[in-house]
């Protein structure tokens, strides 16, 4: 992970907090998107859009389906950033 | 309210009447499904079918309302109907009782609504719920739901929606889910707030027909002026997920405020 990737990840967290009205402290790695952070099925679509905005790439639907926690999403974002 | 013997007998009498109305409506629905609906389908061209089916359903609901009002179970009062134009709008209503949905389906002859899967598969009503061109409720494909609403509104349908997603639980605060806001924002539909009060509570969540109250139910339905959903936002336009959250809160506060003032009015009258 280089500095640019760290920056992008930080930007991702900022967008997440802003778009879904979350406090930075809510974004713990084990925080569950649906149960803890109150995201619903339509938010999931917007989340995919945020991922695209930050990484410039679309997340694989299969991978996205497995995502449950903030940690899961960040891992996917990292993966997409690294493969650039 | 003290539960005197008189009250209990009244309650029992009203519950019996409610039961009879349910059976009566069941018979009407059965006749509708077996005789009237096939007849209607035979003489209606496909393009007009869905609308006519909804019109027929509305007749059934009107009969039910007549029965309910006729035997003194409920009295329904309307306000704000003078300049009411709901074409292409979302009718956004709170949902204290079964009666409010029944009444709104009766009052607006071709009203559309989001049909729950349970109703699409209902053993008695499914011919109506499936042929009426109602919007299919779908958790799996929310954007399709939004698009269906957009299309329906574009052809002039009035779309009834309950932000709570179910009947209000008495004693618990109003809780609006975000679906209504998402639909209104993404399909860009004006909304008509419909504030409904039901006193005393009847046919609420957890109160079936055999637990009717001991006095006549007064259902007051107030139509407010149509407005943009963004009117309920706290800040100027921002990203959709954020807007949906703000607007849902704004909508909820609006209803809480207006329900509180209507309760105050009722208390003063009685």
Model-based region annotation:
Chain A
Residues 1-25, 78-84:
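Thiotemplate assembly-line natural product biosynthesis machinery
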Residues 13, 30, 48:
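Generic structural marker for isolated residues within well-ordered, non-membrane alpha-helices
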Residues 18-38, 55-63:
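Phosphopantetheine carrier-protein modules
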Residues 25, 45, 70-71:
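Residues in well-ordered alpha-helical elements
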Residues 41:
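Catalytic nucleophile serine of serine hydrolases
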Residues 44-66:
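Phosphopantetheinylated carrier protein domains
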Residues 65-83:
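C-terminal structural segments of small proteins and small subunits
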């Amino acid at each position: 992970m280089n500095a640019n990737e760290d920056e992008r990840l930080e930007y991702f967290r900022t967008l997440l907090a802003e778009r879904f009205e979350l406090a930075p402290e809510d974004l713990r790695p084990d925080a569950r998107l649906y149960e803890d952070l109150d995201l619903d099925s339509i938010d999931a679509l917007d989340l995919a859009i945020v991922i695209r905005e930050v990484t410039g790439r679309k997340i694989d639907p299969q991978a996205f389906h497995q995502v449950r926690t903030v940690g899961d999403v960040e891992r996917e974002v990292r993966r997409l950033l690294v493969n650039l | 309210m003290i539960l005197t013997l008189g009250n209990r007998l009244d309650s029992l009498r009203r519950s019996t009447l409610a039961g009879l109305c349910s059976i009566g409506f069941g018979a009407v629905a059965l006749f509708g499904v077996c005789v009237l609906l096939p007849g209607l389908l035979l003489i209606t061209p496909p393009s007009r079918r869905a609308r006519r089916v909804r019109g027929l359903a509305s007749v059934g609901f009107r009969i039910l309302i007549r029965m309910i009002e006729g035997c003194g179970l409920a009295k329904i009062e309307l306000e704000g109907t003078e300049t009411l134009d709901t074409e292409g709008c979302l009718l956004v209503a709170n949902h204290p009782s079964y009666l409010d949905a029944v009444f709104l389906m009766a009052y607006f002859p071709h009203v559309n609504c989001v049909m729950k899967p349970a109703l699409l598969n209902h053993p008695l009503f499914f011919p109506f719920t499936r042929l009426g061109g109602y919007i299919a409720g779908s958790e799996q494909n929310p954007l399709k739901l939004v698009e269906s609403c957009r299309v329906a509104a574009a052809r002039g349908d009035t779309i009834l929606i309950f932000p709570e997603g179910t009947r209000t639980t008495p004693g618990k605060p109003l809780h609006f889910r975000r679906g209504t806001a998402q639909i209104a924002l993404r399909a860009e539909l004006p909304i008509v707030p419909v504030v409904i009060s039901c006193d005393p509570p009847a046919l609420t969540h957890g109160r079936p027909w055999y637990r009717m109250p001991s006095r006549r139910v007064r259902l007051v339905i107030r139509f407010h002026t149509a407005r943009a959903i963004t009117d309920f936002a706290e800040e100027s336009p921002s990203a959709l997920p954020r807007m949906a959250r703000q607007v849902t809160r704004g909508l909820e506060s609006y209803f809480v405020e207006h329900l509180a003032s209507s309760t105050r009015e009722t208390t003063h009258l009685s």
